[in-house]
Amino acid sequence: MKILHTADWHIGDKHGPSNNGVNLRAQDTLNCLNELVRVAKEEKPDLVLVSGDIFDTAEIMQRRSHQEVLQARNIIFQLSKAAGNVIVMRGTPNHDSEWAFEELKGHFELVPNVQIVTQPQVITLDGVSVAVLPGFDRGVFRAKYPGLGKEEENEVLTGEISNIVKGLKTMCGTDDLTILMAHYTVPGCNVESGQVMMLTPVSYTHLRAHETSAH
Protein backbone atom coordinates (compact mmCIF):
# COMPACT_ATOMS: atom_id res chain seq x y z
CA MET A 1 0.00 0.00 0.00
CA LYS A 2 1.25 3.48 -0.91
CA ILE A 3 0.41 6.20 1.64
CA LEU A 4 0.92 9.95 1.32
CA HIS A 5 1.03 11.60 4.74
CA THR A 6 0.92 15.38 5.12
CA ALA A 7 -0.04 17.90 7.81
CA ASP A 8 0.37 21.46 9.08
CA TRP A 9 -0.59 23.22 5.87
CA HIS A 10 -1.37 26.44 7.78
CA ILE A 11 -3.28 28.00 4.90
CA GLY A 12 -3.84 31.73 5.38
CA ASP A 13 -2.17 35.12 5.50
CA LYS A 14 0.90 35.39 7.73
CA HIS A 15 3.15 38.19 8.93
CA GLY A 16 5.50 38.98 6.08
CA PRO A 17 5.97 40.80 2.78
CA SER A 18 3.24 41.33 0.22
CA ASN A 19 3.18 42.18 -3.47
CA ASN A 20 0.20 43.92 -5.07
CA GLY A 21 -1.93 42.95 -2.09
CA VAL A 22 -0.86 39.28 -2.18
CA ASN A 23 0.65 37.89 1.02
CA LEU A 24 3.84 36.23 -0.23
CA ARG A 25 4.14 33.76 2.63
CA ALA A 26 0.56 32.61 2.05
CA GLN A 27 1.33 32.27 -1.65
CA ASP A 28 4.43 30.19 -0.83
CA THR A 29 2.19 27.85 1.16
CA LEU A 30 -0.17 27.40 -1.79
CA ASN A 31 2.80 26.82 -4.11
CA CYS A 32 4.03 24.05 -1.81
CA LEU A 33 0.56 22.48 -1.70
CA ASN A 34 0.34 22.57 -5.49
CA GLU A 35 3.67 20.72 -5.57
CA LEU A 36 2.19 18.18 -3.16
CA VAL A 37 -0.68 17.66 -5.60
CA ARG A 38 1.77 17.23 -8.47
CA VAL A 39 3.63 14.51 -6.56
CA ALA A 40 0.34 12.80 -5.65
CA LYS A 41 -0.72 12.72 -9.30
CA GLU A 42 2.62 11.18 -10.18
CA GLU A 43 2.72 8.63 -7.34
CA LYS A 44 -1.02 7.78 -7.25
CA PRO A 45 -1.17 6.79 -3.55
CA ASP A 46 -3.81 4.41 -2.25
CA LEU A 47 -4.40 6.60 0.77
CA VAL A 48 -3.78 10.27 1.62
CA LEU A 49 -3.74 11.21 5.31
CA VAL A 50 -3.87 14.88 6.28
CA SER A 51 -3.17 15.09 10.02
CA GLY A 52 -4.54 18.49 10.93
CA ASP A 53 -3.73 22.19 11.19
CA ILE A 54 -5.05 22.81 7.71
CA PHE A 55 -5.51 26.49 8.52
CA ASP A 56 -3.16 28.96 10.19
CA THR A 57 -5.59 30.95 12.32
CA ALA A 58 -9.01 29.95 13.63
CA GLU A 59 -10.26 33.35 14.79
CA ILE A 60 -10.51 35.44 11.62
CA MET A 61 -13.33 37.24 9.85
CA GLN A 62 -15.81 35.05 8.01
CA ARG A 63 -14.99 36.30 4.51
CA ARG A 64 -11.31 35.45 4.85
CA SER A 65 -12.10 32.12 6.52
CA HIS A 66 -14.41 31.21 3.64
CA GLN A 67 -11.66 32.03 1.14
CA GLU A 68 -9.19 29.83 3.01
CA VAL A 69 -11.70 26.97 3.16
CA LEU A 70 -12.09 27.20 -0.62
CA GLN A 71 -8.31 27.04 -1.01
CA ALA A 72 -8.18 23.93 1.17
CA ARG A 73 -11.12 22.42 -0.70
CA ASN A 74 -9.35 22.81 -4.03
CA ILE A 75 -6.21 21.06 -2.79
CA ILE A 76 -8.17 18.23 -1.15
CA PHE A 77 -10.33 17.74 -4.23
CA GLN A 78 -7.25 17.45 -6.45
CA LEU A 79 -5.76 14.93 -4.01
CA SER A 80 -9.00 12.94 -4.15
CA LYS A 81 -8.65 12.62 -7.92
CA ALA A 82 -5.08 11.36 -7.56
CA ALA A 83 -5.60 8.91 -4.67
CA GLY A 84 -7.84 6.03 -3.70
CA ASN A 85 -9.04 7.62 -0.45
CA VAL A 86 -8.38 10.84 1.44
CA ILE A 87 -8.82 11.37 5.19
CA VAL A 88 -8.56 14.94 6.51
CA MET A 89 -8.43 15.36 10.27
CA ARG A 90 -9.04 18.51 12.30
CA GLY A 91 -5.95 19.69 14.19
CA THR A 92 -5.83 22.00 17.19
CA PRO A 93 -8.70 24.49 17.73
CA ASN A 94 -6.41 27.53 17.63
CA HIS A 95 -5.73 26.70 13.97
CA ASP A 96 -8.65 24.61 12.70
CA SER A 97 -11.93 26.21 13.75
CA GLU A 98 -15.09 24.17 14.13
CA TRP A 99 -16.87 26.49 11.68
CA ALA A 100 -14.23 26.08 8.97
CA PHE A 101 -14.30 22.29 9.24
CA GLU A 102 -18.09 22.19 9.12
CA GLU A 103 -17.94 24.17 5.88
CA LEU A 104 -15.22 21.87 4.59
CA LYS A 105 -17.40 18.84 5.40
CA GLY A 106 -20.23 20.31 3.35
CA HIS A 107 -18.03 20.57 0.27
CA PHE A 108 -17.25 16.84 0.36
CA GLU A 109 -20.58 15.30 1.36
CA LEU A 110 -21.02 13.91 -2.16
CA VAL A 111 -17.37 12.91 -2.67
CA PRO A 112 -17.25 9.26 -1.55
CA ASN A 113 -13.48 8.89 -1.24
CA VAL A 114 -12.97 11.94 1.03
CA GLN A 115 -13.69 11.92 4.76
CA ILE A 116 -13.41 15.03 6.94
CA VAL A 117 -12.97 14.00 10.60
CA THR A 118 -13.51 16.18 13.67
CA GLN A 119 -14.07 13.54 16.38
CA PRO A 120 -12.13 10.38 17.33
CA GLN A 121 -13.22 7.46 15.18
CA VAL A 122 -12.00 4.44 13.22
CA ILE A 123 -12.33 4.41 9.44
CA THR A 124 -12.09 1.01 7.75
CA LEU A 125 -10.99 0.82 4.12
CA ASP A 126 -10.33 -2.53 2.42
CA GLY A 127 -8.44 -4.27 5.21
CA VAL A 128 -7.02 -1.07 6.71
CA SER A 129 -8.24 0.44 9.98
CA VAL A 130 -7.34 4.12 10.43
CA ALA A 131 -7.72 5.21 14.06
CA VAL A 132 -8.21 8.98 13.82
CA LEU A 133 -7.45 11.13 16.87
CA PRO A 134 -7.99 14.85 16.12
CA GLY A 135 -6.52 17.67 18.19
CA PHE A 136 -8.30 18.73 21.37
CA ASP A 137 -9.09 21.92 23.23
CA ARG A 138 -7.04 22.13 26.42
CA GLY A 139 -9.64 24.51 27.81
CA VAL A 140 -12.20 21.70 27.92
CA PHE A 141 -9.89 19.52 30.00
CA ARG A 142 -8.89 22.41 32.26
CA ALA A 143 -12.56 23.04 32.99
CA LYS A 144 -12.99 19.35 33.81
CA TYR A 145 -9.86 19.24 36.00
CA PRO A 146 -9.40 22.78 37.43
CA GLY A 147 -6.43 23.88 39.49
CA LEU A 148 -3.87 21.37 38.23
CA GLY A 149 -0.19 22.25 37.95
CA LYS A 150 1.62 21.84 34.66
CA GLU A 151 2.98 18.36 35.42
CA GLU A 152 -0.33 17.16 36.85
CA GLU A 153 -2.19 18.54 33.85
CA ASN A 154 0.12 16.76 31.42
CA GLU A 155 -0.31 13.52 33.34
CA VAL A 156 -4.10 13.79 33.30
CA LEU A 157 -4.22 14.73 29.62
CA THR A 158 -1.91 11.84 28.75
CA GLY A 159 -4.24 9.49 30.62
CA GLU A 160 -7.31 10.85 28.81
CA ILE A 161 -5.65 10.50 25.40
CA SER A 162 -4.42 7.00 26.29
CA ASN A 163 -7.98 5.94 27.13
CA ILE A 164 -9.24 7.30 23.81
CA VAL A 165 -6.52 5.41 21.92
CA LYS A 166 -7.37 2.20 23.77
CA GLY A 167 -11.03 2.67 22.85
CA LEU A 168 -10.12 3.21 19.20
CA LYS A 169 -7.97 0.08 19.25
CA THR A 170 -10.94 -2.07 20.23
CA MET A 171 -12.77 -0.80 17.14
CA CYS A 172 -9.99 -1.79 14.72
CA GLY A 173 -10.23 -5.02 12.76
CA THR A 174 -8.06 -7.73 14.32
CA ASP A 175 -6.56 -8.71 10.97
CA ASP A 176 -6.40 -5.20 9.52
CA LEU A 177 -3.34 -3.10 8.86
CA THR A 178 -3.83 -0.44 11.54
CA ILE A 179 -2.78 3.20 11.31
CA LEU A 180 -2.91 5.71 14.16
CA MET A 181 -3.52 9.20 12.78
CA ALA A 182 -3.04 11.91 15.41
CA HIS A 183 -2.06 15.52 16.04
CA TYR A 184 0.06 15.42 19.18
CA THR A 185 3.60 16.03 20.39
CA VAL A 186 5.81 12.96 20.71
CA PRO A 187 6.88 12.51 24.39
CA GLY A 188 10.54 13.40 24.84
CA CYS A 189 10.60 15.92 21.98
CA ASN A 190 11.20 19.62 22.38
CA VAL A 191 11.22 21.62 19.16
CA GLU A 192 10.13 24.99 20.51
CA SER A 193 13.62 26.49 20.15
CA GLY A 194 15.20 24.28 17.50
CA GLN A 195 14.92 21.35 15.15
CA VAL A 196 16.69 18.71 17.28
CA MET A 197 14.40 15.93 18.53
CA MET A 198 15.31 13.56 21.35
CA LEU A 199 13.21 10.38 21.25
CA THR A 200 12.90 8.26 24.38
CA PRO A 201 11.16 4.89 24.90
CA VAL A 202 7.52 5.37 25.84
CA SER A 203 4.64 3.12 26.80
CA TYR A 204 1.94 3.05 24.16
CA THR A 205 -0.98 0.96 23.02
CA HIS A 206 0.24 -1.38 20.29
CA LEU A 207 -1.29 -0.50 16.93
CA ARG A 208 0.17 -2.72 14.24
CA ALA A 209 2.04 -1.14 11.35
CA HIS A 210 2.01 2.61 11.25
CA GLU A 211 1.54 5.94 12.99
CA THR A 212 1.05 9.30 11.30
CA SER A 213 1.13 12.38 13.45
CA ALA A 214 1.65 16.11 13.30
CA HIS A 215 2.43 19.02 15.54
Name each region found by the language model.
Residues 7-9, 53-54, 92-94, 135-136, ...:
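Active-site metal-binding loops of divalent metal-dependent hydrolases
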Residues 12-21:
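Conserved P-loop NTPase mechanochemical-coupling segment
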Residues 100-202:
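Conserved catalytic scaffold of divalent metal-dependent phosphoesterases
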Residues 21-123:
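Core catalytic region of metal-dependent phosphoesterases/phosphodiesterases
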Residues 23-31, 153-156, 203-204:
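A short acidic, glycine-rich active-site loop
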Residues 1-4:
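Extreme N-terminal starter segment of soluble prokaryotic enzymes
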Residues 11, 56, 186, 211:
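Short, glycine/acidic-enriched loop or turn micro-motifs at the edges of active sites
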Residues 205-212:
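Conserved small/polar residues in nucleotide/adenosyl-binding loops
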